[in-house]
């Protein structure tokens, strides 16, 4: 079992998991997935790094392993290879929907304590994308902080800061220039020893500069690997965990500009990103109001009298429609409900137009 100041505890291992996983006493050892290279994974255990491959049973289960996972492995004596026998329960799970019209979601990482949403104040700036990232973070279960980068390249950084603050609500926001080491190091206040942080942001937002600054070196250049087998230089489309000199664990991950939304349940997480719409929705006549064409809609009324901005309203409608499309694609029953609701909305609109023509 890992002791204080052990390698695994520096990567965030919680010894209480032993109480929940009796299989740890059956010749298996805990480890954390540092990176995934196709059918192989780099795993850290108390004795050092191993190259993990799936057991037959785990492969047959259809489960996939992602960077950040805690796993149980069986060592192979005298070999750097180990067998991954079990994936331990994930406390947080970062995903996005598959690109295009493919079903399901795409795993990004697991067991993230804090997501840092990085956005540049240059051409990368997009309040609407911040809303998508916030939704992704809400669904994952991780805490979130927004970092606005490149303030040195922005003519009106304070105005943009206030615009994002209106969107972010109580979510903490930092505004920095990644080229200023002192400013970049302010991020360390959010990182506790043993906690794992990951970055969300598009390519060009300045994540690499921030990561290299926090790690004290250009890890982007020295750790490029082949996705197929983990050797040689080939691509940067990988996610990998690194220990921070100041304590804590950092996940280096590729830029993500296109963030397809998904939800396994209701629109509760979306309403957390749009709290003003959730408040106005309490005044709606119908419990299942879509806040679009239904009569006596509290949200539409709030837009008309200026309590909700049109930009936020139309963004909410777009994301809500995207969620419904995802649910319909992955659930035939949801597809039937969506078709029925679209039909009802169409009839309601026709009636409103007809009534308007009579006046």
From Swiss-Prot:
Required co-factors: Zn(2+)
Record's keyword annotation contains Cytoplasm: yes
Keyword terms, alphabetized: Cytoplasm, GTP-binding, Hydrolase, Metal-binding, Nucleotide-binding, Ribosome biogenesis, RNA-binding, rRNA-binding, Zinc
GO molecular function: GTP binding; GTPase activity; metal ion binding; rRNA binding
Protein known as: Small ribosomal subunit biogenesis GTPase RsgA
Any one Pfam family match given in the protein's UniProt record, by short name: RsgA_GTPase
Region ranges (Disordered): 331-359
Compositional bias per record (Basic residues), positions renumbered to this chain: 349-359
Residues in CP-type G domain copies: 101-259
Family per similarity comment: Belongs to the TRAFAC class YlqF/YawG GTPase family. RsgA subfamily.
Localization per record: Cytoplasm
GO biological process, one term: ribosomal small subunit biogenesis
Gene: rsgA
Main location (coarse class): cytoplasm
Chain's role: One of several proteins that assist in the late maturation steps of the functional core of the 30S ribosomal subunit. Helps release RbfA from mature subunits. May play a role in the assembly of ribosomal proteins into the subunit. Circularly permuted GTPase that catalyzes slow GTP hydrolysis, GTPase activity is stimulated by the 30S ribosomal subunit.
InterPro entries registered for this protein in UniProt: G_CP_dom, P-loop_NTPase, Ribosome_biogen_GTPase_RsgA, RsgA_GTPase_dom
A GO CC annotation given for this chain: cytoplasm
Catalytic activity, EC: 3.6.1.-
Free-text remark on how the cofactor is bound: Binds 1 zinc ion per subunit.
Oligomer status and interactors: Monomer. Associates with 30S ribosomal subunit, binds 16S rRNA.
EC main group: hydrolase
Record organism: Leptospira interrogans serogroup Icterohaemorrhagiae serovar copenhageni (strain Fiocruz L1-130)
Lineage: Bacteria, Pseudomonadati, Spirochaetota, Spirochaetia, Leptospirales
Keyword RNA-binding annotated: yes
Chain ranges passing through the membrane: none
Binding-site positions, GTP: 149-152, 201-209
UniProt-annotated binding residues for Zn(2+): 284, 289, 291, 297
């Amino acid at each position: 079992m890992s002791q204080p100041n052990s390698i695994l505890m520096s990567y965030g291992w919680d010894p209480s998991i032993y109480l929940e996983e009796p299989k740890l006493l059956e010749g298996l050892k805990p480890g954390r997935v540092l990176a995934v290279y196709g059918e192989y994974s780099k795993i850290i255990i108390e004795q050092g790094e191993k190259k993990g491959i799936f057991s037959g049973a785990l492969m047959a289960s259809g489960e996939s392993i992602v960077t950040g996972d805690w796993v149980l492995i069986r060592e192979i004596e005298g070999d750097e290879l180990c067998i991954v026998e079990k994936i331990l329960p994930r406390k947080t799970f970062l995903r996005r929907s598959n690109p295009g019209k493919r079903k399901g979601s795409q795993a990004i990482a697991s067991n993230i304590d804090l997501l840092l949403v990085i956005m540049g104040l240059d051409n990368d700036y997009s309040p609407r994308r911040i809303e998508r990232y916030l939704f992704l973070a809400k669904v994952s279960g991780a805490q979130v902080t927004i970092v606005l980068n490149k303030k040195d390249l922005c003519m009106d950084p304070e105005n943009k800061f206030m615009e994002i603050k209106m969107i972010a609500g109580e979510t903490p926001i930092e505004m920095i220039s990644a080229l200023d080491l002192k400013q970049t190091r302010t991020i360390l206040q959010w990182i506790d020893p043993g906690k794992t942080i990951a970055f969300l942001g598009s390519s060009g937002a300045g994540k690499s500069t921030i990561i290299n600054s926090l790690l004290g070196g250009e890890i982007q250049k020295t750790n490029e690997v082949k996705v197929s087998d983990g050797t040689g230089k080939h691509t940067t489309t990988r996610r990998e965990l690194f220990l921070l000199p100041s304590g804590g664990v950092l996940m280096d991950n590729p830029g993500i500009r296109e963030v397809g939304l998904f939800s396994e349940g209701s629109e509760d997480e979306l309403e957390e990103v749009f709290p003003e719409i959730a408040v106005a929705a309490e005044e709606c006549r119908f419990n299942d109001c879509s806040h679009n064409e239904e009569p006596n809609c509290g949200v539409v009324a709030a837009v008309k009298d200026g309590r909700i901005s049109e930009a936020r309203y139309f963004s909410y409608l777009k994301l809500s429609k995207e969620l419904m499309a995802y649910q319909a694609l992955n659930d035939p029953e949801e597809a039937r409900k969506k078709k029925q609701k679209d039909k009802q909305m169409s009839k309601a609109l026709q009636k409103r137009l007809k009534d308007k023509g009579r006046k």
